[in-house]
Amino acid sequence: MNVKKIERVRIVSATTKTPLTLIGTMVGVCQGSDTSSQDKNIGRAISCISQGHYRVLEYVDVYIVMSHISARVAREWYTHIGGQPTRLQESTRYVDCADFNAVMPPSISDNIDAFDKYSRCLDMILKTYKALSELGVPREDCAMVLPLGMTTKLSLKHNARNLMDMSRQRMCSRAYWEYREIFKDLIAKLSEYSNEWKTLCSLIFKPKCEAFGKCTEKNSCGRMNKN
């Protein structure tokens, strides 16, 4: 069993390269505006988004490959179903998990005793998986012993509005730390993908307290007032 900290997000080239130009063009048609100017299209898109007309974000497709994320986060990722996202997950039926990797939470890695217990537990699971396999148990059944902390891979397709809505919840300081790290990586990778994405990321990806100007959580972290 290996414990690693590795880059989690890769943006696939099918992702919309010029999201603001696309949005501005589509909106311009609706408004009867001149759509031949890229600068005007970008300005029109920024204006729409800044005014809260988020439906236009649904024109923008984002294709992502995620790796080295926990099975726990992968399972919870599926709860964000708005915008008809599509996803595939690495299959424990076909992939040999006899040497699986695991996510190491900081609260465990920073505690010597906790790290020891966590590592021992994972090693025991690994030995059990291998023993079941040697007894002729199919991979799909051996996988029943695998932990939620095991790393997995996802192939994802979202639109920008769906990802924006996810960021409201998952960039919150009360969200699970792994989600917050994933969104940091996602924003960094999209910002590198094109200049228009760098601008769009600054407009739409933020925790809901920043988006709404107040905290809407019952159990607030105290970062921002509830009123």
Question: Where does each model-flagged region fall?
Answer:
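Family-specific signature for flavin-dependent thymidylate synthase
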Residues: 1-227
